[in-house]
Amino acid sequence: MTNMNLKHKIFIMLLLVFCSSKIIAQQSQPNVLVFYVDDLRAELGCYGSKTAITPNIDKLATEGVQFNKAYVQQAICAPSRMSTLTGLRPETLGIYSIFTPLRSVHKDVVSVPQLFKENGYKTVSIGKVYHHGTDDKNQWTNYFTKEPNTYNKPENIALLEQFKKEGKKANGPAFENADVADEAYKDGRAAKYAVETLKKLKNDKFIMFVGFSKPHLPFNAPKKYWDLYDKNNFEIPERKKPENMYRLALTNWGELKGYHGIPNDVEYLDDNLTRDLIHGYHASISYVDAQVGKVMEALEALGLRKNTTVIFMSDHGYKIGEYGAWCKHSNEEIDVRVPLIVSRETSYKGRVAGKTSDALVENVDIFPTLVELCGLEGPKTDGKSILQVIDRPNTPWDQVATAVYARGKNIMGCTATDGEWRYTEWRDAKTQDILGAELYEHKNSLLSFKNLSGNTKYKKEEARMKGLLETQFPRNQGPFLQHDTPRN
């Protein structure tokens, strides 16, 4: 055999090995199913809620790893979702409001659907995934748009018709409990679309995002989910605000006040309306829980669970009367801490189930995690893969998680947590001058009622947390990047 023939044979053998390994790698790439829920704090049975009835999400937690200290990068829908889907923080993207679509500013940023589509995956978007439905619409091979809110009670339909005749741009009521089927409201339809799409894709490699709109306002859910709860059993949250908090730390919850029947000239809602809204929030959570159950049941029945990693997550937390406030829109612990459950495909030999982790993880970590999980080559991101924590929940991890919340274009709130303490600086967005600081202790509660910044007793804690904050937000970095489009 000549040297030339030997080299040729070796080349062919190496090529076959390479191609075979690539085929095996592609065959072992898991599918991904992501439940992306709107406005959901960790008000779930598996997270210790004494009130929420969530058997399907609780079951999912027993099948994977439940992260107790997961955080978003901004407590508002659009920037948070952009951060998840690009792996870039809001301060990197320069988008802090709901009025600026991602692609109106960033044409070349690589996103989750874009990367996975380029790598042969069927990419599916159902319901609210991005806040702006136009973002990356062409990167989804299957796209079911975010539907508008639905009202089913005749009196509410008539009310909206009246508003339309009068030329009023007004929202309907803040909650509804019509005695209708799940599909009469949009999240029931989202679950239906998800099940139908899974049947069509059972022989394909896919990544599917199912975006459930509840428990976002309005709290519209079928009556049977309201009937799970007795309104009078809900306790009224502590309404007092933290002592010495920064003047702009909380908003005036204008989002809720924009709904019909909500007074806009009061500091606090009365107990009766407060309980109605808390009731609606819980009914909406149980409604979403039932939809999660339907999709998971289909995943099992179709034989797809064995090769599908499932992620359950939220875009930010929420206040239902705590601090006398409502909705999100802050740097408070209750608004930036979120539920996160990850359950590996059942065929994975190293799969961990029924475990919790106190590792500090962030939604910005999801994209690089998916990249590693599926063996892809991804773009540079601000987040980092948490796959090793998913496989080994006690792995020592990050010391800090950070977030921002802008108050207009001139003031930026930047915040850091180590899982027990939260330190926030309110800065001039251009000069980085500190306008105010807050230090709160959260060892045992999402709520804290005294700003300890400047208290000599906690000088060491404040100095340490300030140092952690400045690792992400150095004072000498120059102005915060700003690409927000003015509201029309």
Curated annotation (Swiss-Prot):
Main location class: periplasm
Keywords carried by this UniProt record: Calcium, Hydrolase, Metal-binding, Periplasm, Signal
GO molecular function: iduronate-2-sulfatase activity; metal ion binding
Gene3D superfamilies tied to this protein: Alkaline Phosphatase, subunit A (3.40.720.10)
Matches recorded under SUPFAM superfamilies: Alkaline phosphatase-like
Subcellular location(s) per record: Periplasm
EC identifiers of the protein: 3.1.6.-
Induction and repression of expression: By ulvan and rhamnose.
Residues annotated with 3-oxoalanine (Cys) modification: C77
One GO cellular component term: cytoplasm
Cofactor descriptive note: Binds 1 Ca(2+) ion per subunit.
Catalytic residues of the enzyme: C77, H131
Signal peptide extent: 1-25
Cofactor: Ca(2+)
Pfam family, one: Sulfatase
PTM note: The conversion to 3-oxoalanine (also known as C-formylglycine, FGly), of a serine or cysteine residue in prokaryotes and of a cysteine residue in eukaryotes, is critical for catalytic activity. This post-translational modification is severely defective in multiple sulfatase deficiency (MSD).
Cross-referenced InterPro entries: Alkaline_phosphatase_core_sf (IPR017850), IDS (IPR035874), Sulfatase_CS (IPR024607), Sulfatase_N (IPR000917)
UniProt binding sites for Ca(2+): D38, D39, C77, D315, H316
Recorded family membership: Belongs to the sulfatase family.
Function: Sulfatase involved in ulvan degradation. Ulvan is the main polysaccharide component of the Ulvales (green seaweed) cell wall. It is composed of disaccharide building blocks comprising 3-sulfated rhamnose (Rha3S) linked to D-glucuronic acid (GlcA), L-iduronic acid (IduA), or D-xylose (Xyl). The sulfatase is most active on ulvan polymers, particularly on xylose-rich ulvan. It can desulfate oligosaccharides containing the motif Rha3S-Xyl2S-Rha3S and thus likely proceeds in an endolytic mode of action, removing sulfates from xylose residues in periplasmic oligosaccharides.
Record's protein name: Ulvan-active sulfatase
Origin species: Formosa agariphila (strain DSM 15362 / KCTC 12365 / LMG 23005 / KMM 3901 / M-2Alg 35-1)
